[in-house]
Amino acid sequence: MPRIRIGNTKEVTEGKTVKFSFTRDDRLQEGFVGRFKGKLFAYDNTCRHLPISLDYGDNRFFDSKGETLVCQTHGAVYEPGTGLCTRGPCAGASLYVLEVIEEDGVLWFDEASLS
């Protein structure tokens, strides 16, 4: 399974996200990496309420204050640091965490971490 280059660490500033594609179970999927309170996080871009993207394809995951991640379709609210849904139709469920590696100023995702 390949190692996927997401981008430069500098691209993921506080409250910003970068999307990337990966393969799971022979299906192309999308993930996103962001930074909240100085720490990186990465999740599968799939709402836990229904299997749809959290964003509208526009790479907008944070609310207007930059404090929570929001599903743009049904309004489910997730904590950026944990992925836990705190409000909405999937309260108590968590986004699927993706392991991202920061190495020499570059962000990587290793598909082998999915197994």
Where are the predicted features?
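N-terminal pre-ligand scaffold of iron-sulfur
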Residues: 1-65, 79-80, 94-115
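Short cysteine clusters
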Residues: 47, 71-74
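A short acidic, glycine-rich active-site loop
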Residues: 68
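Short proline/glycine-enriched turn/loop segments at secondary-structure junctions
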Residues: 87-90, 98
